[in-house]
Swiss-Prot record:
Its cofactor is [4Fe-4S] cluster. It catalyses: [[Fe-S] cluster scaffold protein carrying a second [4Fe-4S](2+) cluster] + N(6)-octanoyl-L-lysyl-[protein] + 2 oxidized [2Fe-2S]-[ferredoxin] + 2 S-adenosyl-L-methionine + 4 H(+) = [[Fe-S] cluster scaffold protein] + N(6)-[(R)-dihydrolipoyl]-L-lysyl-[protein] + 4 Fe(3+) + 2 hydrogen sulfide + 2 5'-deoxyadenosine + 2 L-methionine + 2 reduced [2Fe-2S]-[ferredoxin]. GO terms for cellular component: cytoplasm. [4Fe-4S] cluster 2 binds at residues 64, 68, 71. This is Lipoyl synthase.
Length: 290
């Protein structure tokens, strides 16, 4: 086992952007007391996305019931109950930001009977009521594999249904101890087979996986009906989180992109700063994916 990845390379140095769009996005989110995965998960693309007037809305609060070792979101066994005004607040924020394509995600809420699925449905419907014509990408949790909860959300027919497997199966115990690799694949498969949705998933690299394992997981995703994939570098949020095993080079990310395309994915984003909702509008299907 090596002692670590060493000094962060130049290609991982973040260029901070600001300006009027950044300030107005931050002001809008603060005014409505809205959470974003950009801020809660310490995303490296926050400045870029907010400067372009985009954000990924985080539903069900900013406290998760799980403790994945890669994630910066806070954890508790019993977070506060969901804000009943959150769906309407997000709908108004989408309208104010003039978004054509809105991205929603949420924390895991294993403390709620339906995992928060009803709140998801209320948010989707509120957005569509106020913003006719907007397309939605829903980056959902696994709802503990509860098919009724999954179906509640999938029946709303979001334009893109996203669920991240995050890493290869050999790293699940260390990275996602409260999740199951096969369960996450089953979420993707259900969205495709039962509801014919455009499907998407994401993985992080630099967490101890091998290239062979990554390629095998990409084929697993395709075999379960996944259309689109993102691959990005894992960056340790704090000293208490899982250490980075290595920094993947831009050339390797390009090779991963080619591997994914060869596996049959319709859209692929692969790069050091790529995250599941990064440039999500580029994944918006212009034709029905099946």
């Amino acid at each position: 086992m090596n002692s670590g990845p060493g000094k962060k390379p130049d290609w991982l140095k973040i260029k901070l952007a600001s300006g009027s769009s950044f300030a107005s996005t931050r002001k809008l989110l603060n005014r409505h007391s809205l959470h974003t995965v950009c801020r809660s998960a310490m995303c490296p693309n926050l400045h870029e996305c907010w400067s372009k007037g985009t954000a990924t809305f985080l539903l069900l609060g900013n406290v998760c019931t799980r403790s994945c070792r890669f994630c910066a979101v806070g954890t508790e066994c019993r977070p506060a109950m969901p804000d009943p005004e959150e769906p309407s607040k997000i709908a108004e924020a989408v309208k104010t930001m003039k978004l054509r394509h809105a991205v929603l995600t949420s924390v895991n809420r294993d403390d709620l009977a339906d995992g928060g699925a009803t709140h998801w449905v209320e948010t989707i419907r509120a957005i569509r009521e106020v913003n006719p014509g907007v397309s939605l990408e829903c980056l959902i949790p696994d709802f503990s594999g509860n098919e009724q909860s999954l179906d509640l959300v999938m029946q709303e027919l979001p334009e893109v249904l996203n669920h991240n497997i995050e890493t290869v199966p050999s790293r699940y115990a260390a990275v996602r101890p409260q999740a199951l690799y096969e369960r996450s694949l089953a979420v993707i498969e259900r969205a495709k087979r039962q509801f014919r949705l455009a499907t998407k998933s994401g993985m992080m690299v630099g967490m101890g996986e091998t290239e062979e394992e990554l390629e095998a997981s990409l084929h697993d995703l395709r075999g379960h009906g996944c259309d689109m994939v993102t691959i990005g570098q894992y960056l340790q949020p704090t000293a208490a989180h899982l250490p980075v095993s290595r920094y993947v080079t831009p050339e390797e990310f390009e090779r991963y992109r080619e591997i994914a395309l060869d596996a049959g994915f319709r859209h692929v984003q692969s790069g050091p700063f790529v995250r599941s909702s990064y440039h999500a509008e580029a994944f918006e299907p212009v034709e029905k994916i099946s």
